[in-house]
Amino acid sequence: MADTYGLSCDPPRGWQVAVMRRPGTVPPAAGARIAVAVEQDVTRPVLHACTRSMPADRGDFGSGVVELLGPDDVFVALVDYGTEVADQGLFEKQGLPRLAPSQFGPNRLQRPLPGRSASQHFFSSGGRAFCLFTVLGSHARRMASVPRAAALVKTLHITDRASLAREGGHP
């Protein structure tokens, strides 16, 4: 998959992957100087990956698709929180997390969905802050589903802030 917004993925067979940014104000290029600070709604890129086809209309954390997951399906969202909060507080951990079945639970979903399970990890990579949100179609089948999710996560590539600045990209 081509690198879009500094996010790319080489998914295992059977995964659908999309990178998008909602309409809104694009943040300044990494390293750009801003003359006057103005409060604006800034949108950031989101990478979605799923073992089933995804509807075009879906939320950043998978609303519109996680409800459709079958018992063997997996959904992954990599949500960019920007450079301003990277490497500190909630985003202090470095690098993509390793997924394990023990990290998943039905109570980790944004709202209750019978039978499903999720995990959520906050981290930084290359001066950028992220949330990795993963939903399994069946909590009971997490021992089989988590390795599939982990295989996808291993193929994620995040372009660091400095490289984006050199290339004139927008995180």
Give the location of each predicted region.
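Secretory pathway targeting signatures of secreted, lumenal, and periplasmic proteins
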Residues: 1-87
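Short, isolated positions in well-ordered beta-strands
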Residues: 7-9, 98, 130
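Residues that flank catalytic or metal-binding motifs in active/ligand-binding sites
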Residues: 11, 119, 152
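Surface-exposed amphipathic alpha-helical segments
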Residues: 15, 131-171
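Glycine-rich loops and low-complexity Gly/Arg-rich segments
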Residues: 24-27, 33-36, 102, 147, ...
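Signature of long, low-cysteine stretches enriched in small and polar/charged residues
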Residues: 56-127, 135-136, 140
